[in-house]
UniProtKB/Swiss-Prot annotation:
CDD domains: RPS2. Belongs to the universal ribosomal protein uS2 family. SUPFAM superfamilies: Ribosomal protein S2 (SSF52313). The keyword Ribosomal protein applies. Gene3D superfamilies: Glucose-6-phosphate isomerase like protein, domain 1, Helix hairpin bin. It comes from Bacillus cytotoxicus (strain DSM 22905 / CIP 110041 / 391-98 / NVH 391-98). GO terms for biological process: translation. This is Small ribosomal subunit protein uS2. It comes from the Bacteria. It holds the Pfam family Ribosomal_S2. GO terms for molecular function: structural constituent of ribosome.
Amino acid sequence: MSVISMKQLLEAGVHFGHQTRRWNPKMKRYIFTERNGIYIIDLQKTVKKVEEAFNVMRNIAAEGGDILFVGTKKQAQEAIKEEATRAGMYFVNQRWLGGTLTNFQTIQKRIKRLKDIERMQEDGTFDVLPKKEVVQLKKELERLEKFLGGIKDMKGLPSALFVVDPRKERIAVAEARKLNIPIIGIVDTNCDPDEIDHVIPANDDAIRAVKLLTSKMADAILEAKQGEETVTA
């Protein structure tokens, strides 16, 4: 049975690409036709590519690898957080902080600061500190949680990146490429597919499309984890 059906893709609007004037010619092989000034993505290719990406994600998870979900555009933020959390993986859904991968040690220092403030909040330290200081610490905690909350338990570099809109997330993509971390990505008609190891040609602007595809990637991870549980049980 295939991972995803044409009907599901159509209903979520996965086939709608960008306007024809905003395209990357390298995406030509994934385009079916042009309609009213918009490129229509070839969903038969998307079905195959979702299947490929699903298998890649499942295999990485089965080997105990961690996958970092990245999507900071408005349409992706919620799905990225929800599906990464459901799969027990990590995510960045606000702003990608430069050096998140290439300067991971520095990022870890900021995560340590985040955890230190959390501990202070939990162990009663806040109760004995001046009110003004507590207000500042809470603000700092809020900011750190916003940007680093999704990776605060990530001990090392991820085994792979799942990215929504590599054009928007070009810094994350560049960092992963520099470190030879494989990238699985939802790639629209205005993106460069050559930068992505496993391309899912799809509409990256519709919330339903992003949610559908991201949930399938989370399903792949959960399938691998359930397989492990069956083996150990």
